[in-house]
Amino acid sequence: MARCERLRGAALRDVLGRAQGVLFDCDGVLWNGERAVPGAPELLERLARAGKAALFVSNNSRRARPELALRFARLGFGGLRAEQLFSSALCAARLLRQRLPGPPDAPGAVFVLGGEGLRAELRAAGLRLAGDPSAGDGAAPRVRAVLVGYDEHFSFAKLREACAHLRDPECLLVATDRDPWHPLSDGSRTPGTGSLAAAVETASGRQALVVGKPSPYMFECITENFSIDPARTLMVGDRLETDILFGHRCGMTTVLTLTGVSRLEEAQAYLAAGQHDLVPHYYVESIADLTEGLED
């Protein structure tokens, strides 16, 4: 049972010694805004030298995989391959490739509520986008899925159009994630994809398929490409309701870092209330603290 214990000393060495790999969330874990968390790049280098696999799982749907890889490099995280990066945008593209209804000779289109990074990921997967000039001439393909991602230009008109498509019972409703809000550098909040998805669900009367954390579907995307034993894998994140719940659902050892959204007091409150799926096994002040558990 998870007890939210501080990870240090002999326990830290034991946990990292048994682990074959680590899954990291990105925002609030590796970096905040345009600044890497102090010591985070060095930790990843040490993990690589120790032969521990590191993979990265983000609910952020704003960047396609190549752009996300560039951000890692810009913030000082060198030596990583794009194949190590898994975003909710990438996983949404995979799900739509698998489940988009319609005959093979008449593939349907996806109506996207989201930015250019999400659209680029879908195009890279060979999907057609509603209203996309790149779809070519001729009759517009039938919309067979509505995808809700992070959309800074969300509007009533977009909501109305999404609902019109969803009147077709065969049209899928997919959301990249349910993060309700995101913190800003000034301490305020901005609405997240979860808020937009809730609006579409309420207005359409439909329930979205969610691909991002805490959905195990994201873990399925990872295990399609990497051989992972969840019992010997750590999930390190900053958000109890997404990262830690995701880790528990997938059978991993969970570690909360306090450099992001969730506070230690919240985890302790969940522990007192018996909501153990939201309680991390361990916590650290920063992921840089994990370096002490690795042998030179």
From Swiss-Prot:
The active site is at 25 (nucleophile), 27 (proton donor). GO terms for biological process: actin rod assembly; cellular response to ATP; dephosphorylation; positive regulation of actin filament depolymerization; protein dephosphorylation; pyridoxal phosphate catabolic process; regulation of cytokinesis; regulation of mitotic nuclear division. Inhibited by NaF, Zn(2+), Ca(2+), Mn(2+) and EDTA. Mg(2+) binds at residues 25, 27, 238. It is found in: Cytoplasm, Cytosol; Cytoplasm, Cytoskeleton; Cell projection, Ruffle membrane; Cell projection, Lamellipodium membrane. Ubiquitously expressed (at protein level). Highly expressed in all the regions of central nerve system except the spinal cord. Also expressed at high level in liver and testis. In fetus, it is weakly expressed in all organs except brain. It is a peripheral membrane protein. One of its GO terms (molecular function) is phosphoprotein phosphatase activity. Keywords: Cell membrane, Cell projection, Cytoplasm, Cytoskeleton, Hydrolase, Magnesium, Membrane, Metal-binding, Pyridoxal phosphate. Substrate binds at residues 58-60, 182, 213. Functions as a pyridoxal phosphate (PLP) phosphatase, which also catalyzes the dephosphorylation of pyridoxine 5'-phosphate (PNP) and pyridoxamine 5'-phosphate (PMP), with order of substrate preference PLP > PNP > PMP and therefore plays a role in vitamin B6 metabolism. Also functions as a protein serine phosphatase that specifically dephosphorylates 'Ser-3' in proteins of the actin-depolymerizing factor (ADF)/cofilin family like CFL1 and DSTN. Thereby, regulates cofilin-dependent actin cytoskeleton reorganization, being required for normal progress through mitosis and normal cytokinesis. Homodimer. This is Chronophin. It comes from Homo sapiens. The gene is PDXP.
